[in-house]
């Protein structure tokens, strides 16, 4: 059986990434694929428990503790959800993955990239998403969207400066991995953003089909 593909969706809080997950799931299902939609932190019983701890605004923690908890949740996520799904041929779509750790704990909190690199290698070995769609919005746009949706969690309560560091870290990742990370202007009209996402996913699908045909 052919191994499934791994797609991740990234962006600062309020970028609108979650809005497009349902569309992406339907697109892949229409191709006749089994699709597993999940999220980080979370995706497993332990991961969801860690998520509650990480998002609780009453719970202060050292930046490196935060990074370690994120990767602990990720290890469980890989073992219980992501790898089994990929091995049986399913496609996995995750709301955030390791790029978020480099952006939030690295860029936002200042955890050294070398430490995150080591954690990534230890937890994931050679596993990396096949495609990442990053929704980029100015910090002020993301903040305005959040203010009208829900009570802020521990990350959402951070300053604009924090989110600017996170955003810049994401953009640096996109420059570092241009073949994998595709940037979408999330500040555009919803219909325009959907069109951009559709083009990216269609191109990815076409490239896969061409490769399989040649093989």
From Swiss-Prot:
The EC number(s) attached to this protein equal: 2.7.4.9
**Keyword set for this entry?**
ATP-binding, Kinase, Nucleotide biosynthesis, Nucleotide-binding, Transferase
All disulfide bonds of the chain are: none
**Domain of life here?**
Bacteria
User: Record's InterPro entries?
Assistant: P-loop_NTPase (IPR027417), Thymidylate_kin-like_dom (IPR039430), Thymidylate_kinase (IPR018094)
Its Gene Ontology cellular component terms are: cytosol
Question: Where, in this chain's numbering, is ATP bound?
Answer: 11-18
Q: Does the keyword Lipid metabolism apply?
A: no
Gene3D superfamilies membership: P-loop containing nucleotide triphosphate hydrolases (3.40.50.300)
What family is this?
Answer: Belongs to the thymidylate kinase family.
Q: What does this protein do?
A: Phosphorylation of dTMP to form dTDP in both de novo and salvage pathways of dTTP synthesis.
> What is the protein name stated in its UniProt record?
Thymidylate kinase
Give the species this sequence originates from.
Nitrosomonas europaea (strain ATCC 19718 / CIP 103999 / KCTC 2705 / NBRC 14298)
